[in-house]
Design a protein with these regions (language model features):
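Glycine-rich, positively charged N-terminal anion/phosphate-binding segment
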Residues: 24-30, 43-118
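Active-site beta-loop-alpha junctions enriched in small/polar residues
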Residues: 43-45, 69-71, 105-107, 132-134, ...
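Short acidic/polar active-site loop segments enriched in Thr and Asp
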Residues: 61-62, 125, 198, 253
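Short glycine-enriched, charge-decorated loop/helix-capping segments at active-site entrances
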Residues: 79-81, 142-148, 275
């Protein structure tokens, strides 16, 4: 495994110019495997291969979607995909055995199609398209959620990618409800679903909403009723109770967990346990005991320490502890102890003193 690329590095990887769509195979539908129930969300700058590894060890996740790989006007070399999604070097799975689907971000149908074809050659679990990123730098270049202002462009991108990818490889997409408002939500969803996508994840907020609550799960229900492909609900699922309410309101049994899973690594397992008839755990507490999670925090640090540049290491551990402290008093104490620390050696000493050896 190798470190992920920065956004700048991704944009600077230039090799083969993109061509046209004429050589792509005609798409013919085949039987697809049943969709999973709980997905782990792509989160740029947070949920990279290191945290995917740790969270999938806890369990309960059926599939992950990677952070985005930016596609501009070139055919990227294979090493770009494997740097961002090193699980591709492990058969497309995390070390816990959970499938990972690479996500592409761009606005050029030709280049997205060519890059999708290339990544499909090393990604047995499909290709995902990003139509929801709210980052200003992405939107200024016409990518991510900016595409939700142009349903007709979505209706060009999705079929181009679908034709370029072998028929047995799934193509999915993730969208928000819209850019400045949700007026085009159904039109965008229909453009995606009717163009050959196998699955659609809907983050139940607009770009303008950002990450502010609430998530409008009822709009996911509207989309689910309007399209004929599986629709996955995403947004503001922090607890088992949230998951149950989201399913009820959205009409979707499929959930994508993001910040809720980073905050409570046992959330997916807790949802499954509740589905199986277990009593929900107390709200406001972590779904797995701190003594169970602490060794994984140590493993996370070891991965960060060995894979990332020294200047990024302390920040990554503090970033995760900042989420964990919402559920774990012990994480609050750890975060406060390390809050002003940037020296990896000092962090390593703290880990050695506080995390039991396996």
């Amino acid at each position: 495994l190798t470190p992920t690329l920065s956004q700048r590095e991704r944009g600077q990887e230039k090799r083969t110019p993109c061509s046209d769509l004429s050589s792509y195979q005609k798409y013919s539908s085949l039987d697809k495997p049943a969709p999973p129930t709980i997905l782990l969300a792509p989160m740029e700058g947070l949920l990279d291969f290191v945290l995917r590894d740790i969270l999938t060890r806890v369990g309960g996740v059926d599939r992950c979607v990677s952070e985005f790989i930016r596609v501009s006007d070139t055919l990227l070399p294979e090493r770009v995909f494997t740097r961002v999604v090193p699980e591709l070097l492990n058969g497309g799975r995390t070390f816990a055995g959970v499938p990972v689907r690479p996500q592409l971000l761009g606005s050029d149908a030709v280049c997205l199609a060519e890059n999708a074809a290339r990544v499909a050659g090393i990604s047995p679990f499909g290709v995902d398209l990003n139509f929801g990123c709210p980052a200003k730098v992405v939107n200024r270049h016409g990518g991510g959620a900016a595409l939700l202002q142009e349903p007709e462009l979505l209706a060009t991108i999705v079929p181009a990618v679908r034709r370029a990818v072998p028929a047995h490889i799934p193509v999915s997409a993730k969208m928000r409800l819209g850019f400045s408002d949700a007026s085009l939500a159904l039109e965008c969803a229909h453009a995606i679903a009717s163009s050959g996508a196998d699955e659609l994840v809907v983050h139940a907020r607009t770009k303008a909403d950002g990450y502010r609550p609430p998530a409008y799960w009822e709009r996911v229900a509207d989309i689910g009723a309007a399209v004929s492909i599986p629709v996955v609900a995403n947004g503001e699922v922090w607890t088992v109770d949230d998951a149950l309410r989201c399913r009820a309101v959205s009409g979707s049994h499929m959930l994508m967990l993001g910040r809720g899973m980073v905050t409570d690594p046992g959330l997916a397992l807790a949802i499954r346990a509740t589905d199986a008839g277990a009593a929900p755990h107390a709200q406001g507490q972590g779904s797995v005991a701190w003594r169970t999670l602490l060794p994984l925090v140590g493993d996370f640090w070891q991965l960060v320490h060995s894979r990332l540049e020294p200047r990024a290491q302390a920040g990554r551990l503090k970033q995760w502890l900042n989420f964990l402290r919402r559920r774990y008093p012990e994480a609050e104490a750890a975060y406060m102890a390390l809050r002003t620390v940037n020296d990896p050696k000092v962090v390593a000493a703290w880990v050695a003193a506080n995390v039991p050896e396996r």
